[in-house]
Amino acid sequence: MNNIHNHKILILDFGSQYTQLIARRVREIGVYCELWAWDVTEQQIREFNPTGIILSGGPESTTEDNSPRAPEYVFNAGVPVLGICYGMQTMAMQLGGLTEPSSHREFGYASVSLENSTALFAQLNDDLNSSLPKLDVWMSHGDKVTRLPEGFQLTGTTSTCPIAAMSDESRHFYGVQFHPEVTHTKSGLALLTNFVVNICGCTTNWTPENIIEDAVARIKAQVGDDEVILGLSGGVDSSVTALLLHRAIGKNLHCVFVDNGLLRLNEGDQVMEMFGDKFGLNIIRVNAEDRFLDALKGIDEPESKRKMIGKVFVDVFDEESHKQTSVKWLAQGTIYPDVIESAASKTGKAHVIKSHHNVGGLPDYMKLGLVEPLRELFKDEVRKIGLALGLPAEMLNRHPFPGPGLGVRVLGEIKKEYCDLLRKADAIFIEELYNSGWYYKVSQAFTVFLPVKSVGVMGDGRKYDWVVSLRAVETIDFMTAHWAHLPYDLLGKISNRIINEVDGISRVVYDVSGKPPATIEWE
């Protein structure tokens, strides 16, 4: 079996918004890497035993007294080091160079002229018409290096940044002021490949097939002949977790699918057909619609609804798990970004974005071991694993669906009537997006039920029925988003179908709010 962790890159995070992108690019190259806060100890680095180290960018200034520094051991570990943006600046300062604040922040595209020979830029040139090789890059920095450390040579320069890249070929230390991890830097992936593969000497074993083989072996080693329980929702993470576990332990996996009555049209049947009939998993369906709706009666505040849905789910799942008396382990679909977001730096310098529901252990009363086979994987890697395991692409690439389901897409109090109307309207919206080729052009699309009535005319009669809003957005990271400019004729067709086919809806509106100021979901 290939050892997928034999060669590995350590990425130290100084707080850049692009840091996770560095890790995803290294994984894309085919090499395992981990992302740690910058203030790790020498002992932790020694134990991880990296083949190479990358220092990320960050928002701080190296000219300030308390700014983050790389552990000194990074430069004494005997492995190649690449500093990106702030990472280059702290490398320069810590090794005897000088950095100063720029007269202006440089943000956007730039052309770097390459000087002197360096292994980092081998075979790279984005301007074949120039006498000197050049790279089209993305800059985002305030400070700049003004004096090279001893042993370093200048390898790149721009009109506003005289030292845009530097290298010490004997120690294999490299610095770039730009961001090779973003797609705006044309040869960024090739540059990172030069560092990870050619300079660090990593073998590219990190592939879906090898990851599956490794995950199955680790599950077998962890749980042996014990039985495992998993809450299967039909989402990407729990679905891939289920198939990995099934491949490893077969019928010793018990899947519990809690149908809360807040799912999309026919979704419960589709989950059972997919995992029960097609893949042959040991799966129990718990029809808990009445229980959820009863618990939600009279609750109209969004956060209170979320908490109640979460509480009822835990109660239902706990009851089912107690019926499985021989179960010793609980499986969860925790993925790597969940782990990163929940890891607090020991100095408090690295900010915790949020505490994720999948990280931080189990309720005290659940005396089960924890199995997390996706814990090392990014979402795009989970999808690739799912594809290799036989999950259909349309399921793996489906738009995000919130954990509370329709509970946050029915505004105000949740009633069965509202959910049924919303399910039908949303199914028409999604079907028409598929048929028109727009589904994969937008990042997320859904329908929202508004608890207001509007007058309509059907034939010779007057009707007074409910209103729904269509929402479609385009985004890269879901942190900001633009509303999607769907064609008017498509919106008209969707509206006509919903009003004519869904008895109880008299008006359809389209949400043209961006994020910010609006959030993507209404609640």
UniProtKB/Swiss-Prot annotation:
Q: Which SUPFAM superfamilies match?
A: Adenine nucleotide alpha hydrolases-like, Class I glutamine amidotransferase-like, GMP synthetase C-terminal dimerisation domain
What residues does the Glutamine amidotransferase type-1 domain cover?
8-205
- What's its top-level EC category? ligase
Keyword Transport in record: no
Give one GO term, molecular function aspect: ATP binding
Query: Could you tell me which residue ranges the GMPS ATP-PPase domain spans?
Result: 206-398
Q: In which pathway does it act?
A: Purine metabolism; GMP biosynthesis; GMP from XMP (L-Gln route): step 1/1
Q: What EC designation does it have?
A: 6.3.5.2
Q: Which InterPro entries does the annotation name?
A: Class_I_gatase-like, GATASE, GMP_synth_C, GMP_synth_GATase, GMP_synthase, GMPS_ATP_PPase_dom, NAD/GMP_synthase, Rossmann-like_a/b/a_fold
| Function summary | Catalyzes the synthesis of GMP from XMP.
Return the HAMAP family for the record: GMP_synthase
Q: What name appears for this protein in its UniProt entry?
A: GMP synthase [glutamine-hydrolyzing]
